[in-house]
Amino acid sequence: MFILYLVFMLGIGIWFFVRSKNAGEKDYFLGGREMGAWVSGLSAGASDMSAWVLMGMPASIYAYGMGKAWIPVGLFIGYSLSWIFIAPRLRSFSIVCGDSITIPQYLTNRFKASSRALQIISAVIFLVAYTVYSASSIKACGTLFETVLGIPAQIAMYAAAVIIVGYTFLGGFNAVCWTDFFQGLLMLGSLFAAPIVALCMMQKSGTTAGTLPAGYWNMMTSWQDILSGLGWGLGYAGMPHIIIRFMSVKSDKELKKAAKVGIGWTFFILMFAVLVSVVAHLFLGDGQESSTIFIAIVRRIFTGPWLGLISGLLLSAILAGAMSTADSQLLAASSAFASDVYKPVIRKGQSTDKEMLWVGRIVVLVIAAAALLIASNPGSGTIMSLVENAWGIFGASFGPVIVLSLFWRGFTFSGAAAGIVAGAAVDVLWLVLFKSTGVYEIVPGFAAGLLAAVIASKCSSAESRETAAALFDQCIAYKD
């Protein structure tokens, strides 16, 4: 079943490669801005949640109780607000601002800046953070194959990386979005089926394998849990591989439909992920390896030759989660280097579309190789910690800047540069020096980025403020 699933994903990449031999840079990195509501909505959700929603998050709540449920609460609030407020403006602003196809390109064009400093700074952060983020997805694939099939994790990670790189390398944005569409459906179906069937089996037998620990339902465990959990929602405004979907939708009408699809999918995926952690205590008992509770539930429910096929299909959801996020991250990072460093800085704007496609593909290979090295390192940390670190630096560095660029006329180029640098620096410093406080680094990082962006903008010249304000008004006036 796993093999069939992987072949299907690779087939999508080959299909779009054959169809898009004459495609340009905009088609490869943004789907030509022709994405529909269902594909955009589901692919945004699937690229967001990753295998973490099937392994990392249920594991955290299973191990520590409902105090960690503030994470899905924060995620749902942040995701919903991003679709409602950020998506419509980012789509129209990116079109008016030079038909931008990447986030760094949009930020540079938003201020009519001649300097490429923003693009270069952003691209560097992209490359570093996405390498770490992609490592978490590759690591999840290794855990799955080692637990279910007994295949050594190292071999499994190499195989998964080859498949992910294969269809991303070949098909670009269209292949990534369409594979994410199918993977989003599989993830939701699997997270629904596993806990519900387990509950039905326990109700039928009248017995449970364990009980919930004392205080499990207590969500008011500490102010750090509440603040840090809700702080996860701050990340959405600055998550390039997610918000790039907003820019790719073909019309404002389709965007409104996509928002409903994306928000609805996310609500149910988070709700069932929390349910998995509760059911695991009752159905499996205590003492389970927390990161594999979803795998354990599925394997216990569906046993036997034919039911084993169903088990394989449901467990493919972990592959779906890992692949749907890794492919989006690889493409976002490669587009940042190709469009924001190689084309304007190295080639001085003289590169051809074909050249840009191949540069992007080569960068996909390089980042995937680096991510594989991190994932293969036994000291790289858990899936949860890898996601947490990458999510934090993106949210802290780009979140305030994206929000201000869309909602403040007085925001300037200097403010954007200061916000990105300050947000990233404070996020990393907090992680290194103050992790013991229990406060997620995205919270102080976001606050620092916001403050620096506002102060630097206020200190900018009157001319730069007027230029930014004039373009802001043009963006607001844009209609399909």
Named regions from a protein language model:
Residues 1-480:
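Membrane-embedded helix-loop-helix hairpins and adjacent transmembrane boundary segments
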